[in-house]
Swiss-Prot record:
The modification Phosphoserine is found at residues 3, 6, 560, 565, 583, 585, 680, 712, 727, 729, 733, 745, 849, 876, 880, 884, 892, 895, 897, 1385. Residues 609-631 have a biased composition (Low complexity). It is found in: Cytoplasm, P-body; Nucleus. It holds the Pfam family Ge1_WD40. Belongs to the WD repeat EDC4 family. The keyword Phosphoprotein applies. Its main location: cytoplasm. One of its GO terms (cellular component) is P-body. The lineage of its organism: Eukaryota, Metazoa, Chordata, Craniata, Vertebrata. InterPro entries: EDC4-like (IPR045152), EDC4_C (IPR049404), EDC4_C_sf (IPR044938), EDC4_WD40 (IPR032401), WD40/YVTN_repeat-like_dom_sf (IPR015943), WD40_repeat_dom_sf (IPR036322), WD40_rpt (IPR001680). Residues 971-1030 form a coiled coil. This is Enhancer of mRNA-decapping protein 4. In the process of mRNA degradation, seems to play a role in mRNA decapping. Component of a complex containing DCP2 and DCP1A which functions in decapping of ARE-containing mRNAs. Promotes complex formation between DCP1A and DCP2. Enhances the catalytic activity of DCP2 (in vitro).
Length: 1406
């Protein structure tokens, strides 16, 4: 593999496209190279006669995995202002650049209620901090729910896991810092991966055992200690693509990518588990199973792995998106295949590829469309990865009328089907749902609508669990029983009488600021006729229009089936064939169905195989027409009419919408007056199912012409609709072709072998094929692309007469075939020779491995259950059947409904080949895995070449063997047809029961509806009676109350005043007298009091204070107003004028000064220039004179110095020799004497130490010379032998010698080393001798004592034995030292040392 520096840019770009299958036609070379040439059906269906529905019509090339986009002309710009209520649902997006303005009701401070379309159920209460989390706080699977929390006591990070079915809980711990990201491998996987802020990876396998959650650690990779905490860390699992043959998809990809701040790591978990058994494992100990990708300047934000795990896409805050090719097993470094800036260098926060991971079709390329986001997803862009052009731009902005305009901070997630993009705003309590449409052929994708749903709290993180179809009635979801009942009966009343509508159910688990909630959103998608109508012809899976376009499948629909016309039959061919068994995949190896899968019901087959008159007689009655229509429905759609009409059968959400199979059935009408049209739905079957279906019809030589005529008639009708049309995505752009031609030279042998194999299938003579006929690699590539061949070629290859005019309708030959014919120089020769016998075509393949083919047929029949067996089990299925895959169920029915045909072996396509087979330069890992398959394909190709070259004399035996096989097949076919007749009788009875049950259900519904209407009428009558009673009582009360009031008032006026006046007259006289007397007394007292009060000083002061307080405010206001209105403006004007004058004066003065300064500087510069010229000339002369003198002097000095040096060296060498000899003698003599003295001292000290008593007191050695010992000790210290130096000084029992050592060596040098260099006996002796006399050099002794005591080893037995006595002696000396001089500066250190010794001595006392 070449290094990254030597890669051509065009080569790398084309290599990336080859890996991702971006610009590959529908029949890529890799797909056809995987097809074995030993199977007759495979060669016939894949090479000779491609399915016209899958390759001919451009409208049918869209696959069932992704909803396609109708032809919509987008505007340039659009602004969508959301309203915040339920009317902001499915607002159409009709422009390339769209700005979406958030509603004011979505702000956190708004009091608006949540949306009625959102159902919330709390799961757990916990307070999360409101901020933008770059990773996920929650991970969702079908069985478990995991979310990150913090412990209440210590704040450590944990992950809470909840079982969705039993609500059982458990905790996962052991994280460093917070949990940066967590994710399940896929929805059905029990593997949970967590990544904390330190970069530690945890992978658990969760299981529910006896009602308890059991967690098993699979991988635990630990980062080095001290790794910086960083929240920019992400987990990216390799996408999981479900297989068609898998019932339970719990296996997950072993590849996971980790995004750190400065790098990305891709880990192969299987390799890690095989090489390590115990966890955790440090990352430094792992040598294989991972690869590191570096290439971004700032931290990484998002990433994605291709489904085959060979390409990694990374997005960073530096604005770049880069694609890396990775090989985990090899030694090659990852290389950058492509890079670009999608948002002009702004930080990226989103990288989503629009792949359908729910029902991925092998023909649909991965990574076709890409969604990128920047600035916390405030700007989203849709990209085409073939042309790298922006298709649409969405910008989110805050409400401009809001008081607090907080910019949006959006979290985005794409559902598995790539149909809906869900966004949550961290700064607002709202969820957005955007619908996504794609068109693979035209290379277009866009967002078609946006829906706004208000919540009660902002969503910080969320996980999608289910996005499915549902039925809505008055904006509510139907119950399960009514949902099935209304499916078969709603369309009989027409589109205007519908009570239910197609809806979408989105189930999320959302982390709010206050709680974790289960959120369910139900809404009706956009039903614009301009958008929905083209979907029925572009897509091959469920859509939303079944409520308006679905015909009745009950009795009314069957009754109207006999009044069809010729355009109805033509409309059948426009519908795409179901991709699960009708359409042959041309990009990968086709799904090779057995002949049993093409088996039609006995009623239709007998009518075709017997005679044309039998088909005309079948239209004599209405009942026979109805049964014929029902049987043809079963044959074409592979869905039994019982399962389509039975309202009691449980259906998954995907099956509630009309699939093209039902649309095909519903549009099938028959003409009762024409026998050819009556049989055309059954005779159309060979056109839909090429290959084995034709052999199934032609049972004998006498019936070949009948079947051929029916085939010719149907092909004439189907031919204009099945012509191949060029598609924009099927042709390569010039840059792609040029880059591909350079990369294809190494693959010429493979293409040549494939061309030979296809040449045999196309009956090209061997003489036309030469090794040098392949002119270019592009021609060979075009040969491997699918070339649609129509019905006449099918007839010619099978030995059937296609009728006149069929030979003109054939596809254009490929470039290689044209080159071959030009080299042979036979312009009159035909590309297709005379059609051989059918036995000649099949003998070479059937003789190769007939027994193996029969065994594979039995395996295929064992895998697919018969329809009657499945119908018996459908009623007993529980609600878990709703989770089953609809495509797998239909494929099973398709294979089983035709399971009684012939015994031609058709091995089933391995569903993983389309994922493992890549471009010619795929990774070595994938090449090793597919080595065996390539070998088998090569062997089959060589066998085919050998069979072409065989002489004709071997063919009679092969023909005889083939005839014997055909006889056996015919015999088996008759038996299977009989069994199929019995099966169809049971199916007809089942259909009748289902129709009766549907009618009874409809009758019950109508009866319940009538009862509800009667009850509502009675209720309305009661309400009307109650209203009348209330109105009558109100009228009576108003009338009586007015009259009664007037009469009472009149009576009171006439009676009450006279009586009151008569009774109050004496009382009034008495009161007047008493009041007069009281007033006179009060008047006198009032006058006296008022006079006193007026003369009081307090009153005057109070009045003055009140007046001052009253006038203070107005006066201040008046002065302030006058000052502000009069004084300040006048002062400002005067100051402004003054400053203006000052400014003008200063400016003028500055200008004059500058002018004078410039003139002065110019004159001074001129004078200096004039004075400098003579000085410079003089200096130049002096320099030249100095140089000449210097040269002369240098020569003279060098000669004299050389002579003097030689003389001095001669004299010095002589004297130096004499002095050196004397010095060497003296030094050697001194060193030898010193060495002898040291040796003597060492021997003496050793002897004395050995003879010393155990009391610990050194034996004095008075005979040693003190100076010699100091010299020896100094030498030991210089050599670093500290222990020996202290030991010698202590052994001499001389305190002065010990002080000499202590003064020479710093205590930090002795005790600063991690292991103390002094042994325990030396430490004890040092402590004892230093403490013997603390009167002199107290500071030095105390410092050494403190360090020595701290370095005593209490576990040493010698230390434990002698420490008590030594410490007691030291304490006594310290006590004496403190008593002698208590105010000494060292008393504090001595007291601290005494306390330390007390703690050491006390435990040792008894």
């Amino acid at each position: 593999m070449a290094s990254c520096a030597s890669i051509d840019i065009e080569d790398a770009t084309q290599h990336l496209r080859d890996i991702l299958k971006l610009d590959r036609p529908a029949g890529g070379s890799n797909a056809e190279s995987q097809r074995p040439s030993s199977a007759y059906n495979g060669d016939l269906n894949g090479l000779l006669v491609p399915d016209p529905l899958s390759s001919g019509d451009g409208n049918s090339t869209n696959k069932p995995g992704i909803r396609t986009m109708p032809p919509i002309n987008l505007q340039e710009k659009q602004v969508i202002c959301l309203s915040g209520d339920d009317s902001s649902t499915c607002i159409g997006i009709l422009a390339k650049e769209v700005e979406i303005v958030a509603s004011s009701d979505s702000s956190i401070s708004s009091k608006a209620r949540g949306s009625n379309k959102v159902k919330i159920q709390p799961v757990a209460k916990y307070d999360w901090e409101q901020k933008y989390y770059y990773g996920n706080l929650i991970a969702v699977s079908n069985s478990f729910l995991a979310y990150a929390i913090r412990a209440a006591n210590n704040g450590s990070a944990m992950v809470r896991v909840i079982s969705v079915s039993t609500s059982e809980r458990t905790l996962l711990k052991g994280f460093t810092g917070s949990v940066a990201d967590l994710a399940f491998a896929h929805l059905n996987s029990p593997q949970l991966a967590c990544l904390d802020e330190a970069g530690n990876l945890f992978v658990w396998r969760l299981a529910l055992v006896k009602g308890k959650i059991q967690e098993e650690i699979l991988v635990h990779i630990r980062q080095p200690e001290g790794t910086a905490l960083n929240h920019f860390r992400r987990i990216i699992w390799c996408p999981f693509i479900p297989e068609e043959s898998e019932d339970c998809c719990e296996e997950s990809s072993p590849t996971v990518a980790l995004l750190h701040e400065d790098r990305a790591e891709v880990w192969d978990l299987d390799m890690l588990r095989s090489s390590h058994n115990t966890w955790p494992v440090d990352v430094s100990q792992i040598k294989q199973g991972f690869i590191v990708v570096k290439g971004h300047s700032t931290c990484l934000s998002e990433g994605a792995l291709s489904p085959d795990g060979t390409v990694l896409a990374t997005a960073s805050h530096d604005g770049f998106v880069k694609f890396w090719q990775i090989y985990i097993e090899g030694q090659d470094e990852p290389r950058c295949l492509h890079e670009w800036k999608p948002h002009d260098g702004r930080p990226l926060s989103c990288l989503l590829f629009c792949d359908n991971h729910k029902k991925q079709d092998p023909e649909v390329p991965f990574w076709r469309f890409l969604i990128t986001g920047a600035d916390q997803n405030r700007e989203l862009k849709m990209w085409c990865t073939v042309s790298w052009t922006c298709l649409q731009t969405i910008r989110f902005s805050p409400d401009i009328f809001s008081s607090v305009s907080v910019p949006p901070s959006l979290k985005v997630c794409l559902d598995l089907s790539a149909e809906y993009l869900i966004l949550s705003d961290v700064q607002r309590k709202v969820l957005y749902v955007m619908e996504l449409l794609q068109n693979q052929d035209e290379g277009r994708a866009c967002f078609s609508s946006i829906s706004e749903f208000l919540l009660t709290h902002p969503v910080l993180s969320f996980g999608i669990q289910v996005v499915s179809r549902c039925r809505l009635r008055h904006t509510e979801v139907l119950p399960a029983e009514e949902e099935n009942d209304s499916l078969g009966t709603e369309s009989s009343h027409g589109a205007g009488a519908l009570e239910s509508a197609a809806g979408v159910l989105i189930k999320l688990f959302c982390v709010h600021t206050k709680a974790l909630q289960d959120v369910q959103i139900r809404f009706q998608p956009q039903l614009n006729p301009d958008v929905v109508a083209p979907l029925s012809t572009h897509t091959a899976h469920e859509d939303f229009t079944f409520g308006e376009s679905r015909p009745e499948l009950g009795s009314e629909g069957l009754a109207s089936a006999a009044h069809g016309s010729q355009p109805d039959l033509r409309r059948i061919v426009e519908l795409p064939a179901p991709a699960d068994f009708l359409s042959l995949s041309s990009e990968t190896k086709p799904e090779l169905m057995t002949p049993d899968a093409f088996m039609t019901p006995t009623a239709s087959l007998q009518q075709i195989s017997a005679s044309p008159s039998s088909s005309s007689s079948s239209s004599s009655s209405s009942s026979s027409s109805s049964s014929s229509s029902s049987s043809s429905l079963t044959a074409v759609s592979a869905v039994s009419s019982s399962s389509a009409m039975d309202p009691s059968l449980p259906r998954p959400p995907e099956e509630l919408t009309l699939s093209p199979k039902l649309q095909l059935d519903g549009s099938l009408t028959l003409n009762s007056s024409s026998s050819s049209l009556q049989a055309s739905p059954r005779s159309l079957l060979p056109g839909l199912l090429p290959g084995p279906a034709d052999k199934l019809i032609s049972k004998g030589p006498g019936q070949v012409s009948t079947a051929a005529s029916a085939l010719s008639l149907d092909l004439q009708e189907v031919e204009p609709l099945g012509l191949p049309q060029a598609s924009p995505s099927r042709t390569r752009s010039p840059d792609v072709i040029s880059s591909a031609s350079t990369a294809l030279s190494q693959d010429i042998p493979e293409i040549a072998s494939e061309a030979l194999s296809r040449g045999f299938g196309s009956s090209v003579p061997e003489g036309l094929i030469e090794p040098n006929s392949m002119a270019s690699a592009a021609s060979a590539l075009h040969l491997l692309s699918p070339r649609p061949r129509q019905g006449p070629e099918l007839g010619s290859q099978l030995g059937l007469d296609g009728g006149p005019g069929d030979g003109d309708r054939h596809s254009t030959p490929s470039l290689l075939e044209a080159a071959l014919t030009q080299e042979v120089a036979t312009p009159d020769s035909q590309v297709w020779p005379t059609a051989p016998d059918i036995t000649r075509e099949t003998c070479s393949t059937l003789t190769e491995s007939p027994r193996n083919g029969l065994q594979e047929k039995h395996k295929s029949l064992a895998f697919h259950r018969p329809p009657y067996h499945l119908l018996q089990q459908r009623d007993s299925q529980d609600t878990s059947a709703e989770q089953s895959d609809h495509d797998d169920e239909v494929a099973s029915l398709a294979s089983a409904s035709g399971g009684f045909g012939s015994k031609i072996p058709t091995p089933r396509l391995p569903s993983k080949d389309w994922k493992t087979k890549g471009s010619p330069r795929t990774s070595p890992k994938l090449k090793r895995k597919s080595k065996k398959d390539d070998g088998d394909s090569a062997v089959g190709s060589r066998l085919t070449e050998h069979q072409v070259a065989e002489p004709p004399e071997d063919w009679p035996a092969l023909i005889w063997q083939q005839q014997r096989e055909l006889a056996e097949l015919w015999h088996n076919q008759e038996e299977l047809l009989q069994r199929l007749c019995a099966q169809l009788e049971g199916l007809q009875s089942t259909v009748t029961d289902h129709v009766e049950r549907a009618l009874e259900t409809r009758h019950e519904q109508e009866q319940r509806r009538l009862e509800r209407a009667l009850a509502e009428g009675q209720q309305r009558g009661g309400q009307l009676q109650e209203q009348l009673t209330q109105q009558l009582s109100q009228a009576l009360s108003s009338a009586v109350a007015g009259r009664l009031e007037r009469s009472v008032r009149d009576e009171i006026k006439k009676t009450v005043p006279p009586c009151v006046s008569r009774s109050l007259e004496p009382v009034a006289g008495q009161l007047s007298n008493s009041v007069a007397t009281k007033l006179t007394a009060v008047e006198g007292s009032m006058k006296e009091n008022i006079s006193k009060l007026l003369k009081s000083k307090n009153l005057t002061d109070a009045i003055a204070r009140a007046a001052a307080d009253t006038l203070q405010g107005p006066m201040q206001a008046a002065y302030r107003e006058a000052f502000q209105s009069v004084v300040l403006p006048a002062f400002e004007k005067s100051c402004q004028a003054m400053f203006q004058q000052i400014n003008d004066s200063f400016r003028l003065g500055t200008q004059e000064y500058l002018q004078q300064l410039e003139s002065h500087m110019k004159s001074r510069k001129a004078r200096e220039q004039e004075a400098r010229e003579p000085v410079l000339a003089q200096l130049r002369g002096l320099v030249s004179t100095l140089q000449s003198a210097t040269e002369q002097m240098a020569a003279t000095v060098s000669s004299s110095v050389r002579a003097e040096v030689q003389h001095q060296l001669h004299v010095a060498v002589g004297s130096l020799q004499e002095s050196i000899l004397a010095q060497v003698q003296r030094i050697v003599k001194g060193e030898v004497s010193v060495a002898l003295k040291e040796q003597q001292a060492t021997v003496t000290s050793s002897i004395m130490q050995a003879m010393r008593s155990a009391a610990g007191t050194p034996v004095p050695s008075a005979h040693l010379d003190c100076q010699a010992q100091q010299a020896h000790i100094l030498q030991l210290l210089q050599q670093g032998h500290l222990n020996q130096a202290f030991q010698q000084a202590l052994t001499a029992a001389d305190l002065n010698l010990v002080l000499y050592v202590c003064e020479t060596v710093d205590p930090a040098q002795v005790f600063g080393q991690p292991p103390c260099p002094l042994s325990q006996p030396v430490l004890l002796s040092l402590i004892q001798q230093l403490a013997s006399d603390l009167g002199t050099r107290s500071d030095l002794k105390l410092s050494y004592l403190e360090e020595a005591v701290m370095h005593l080893d209490h576990s040493d037995p010698i230390t434990r034995d002698h420490m008590g006595s030594v410490m007691a002696q030291v304490r006594q000396k310290l006590f004496q030292f403190l008593q002698a001089d208590p105010h000494n500066s060292l008393s504090k250190a001595a007291r601290r040392l005494s306390l330390m010794l007390h703690g050491l001595v006390t435990p040792s006392l008894p």
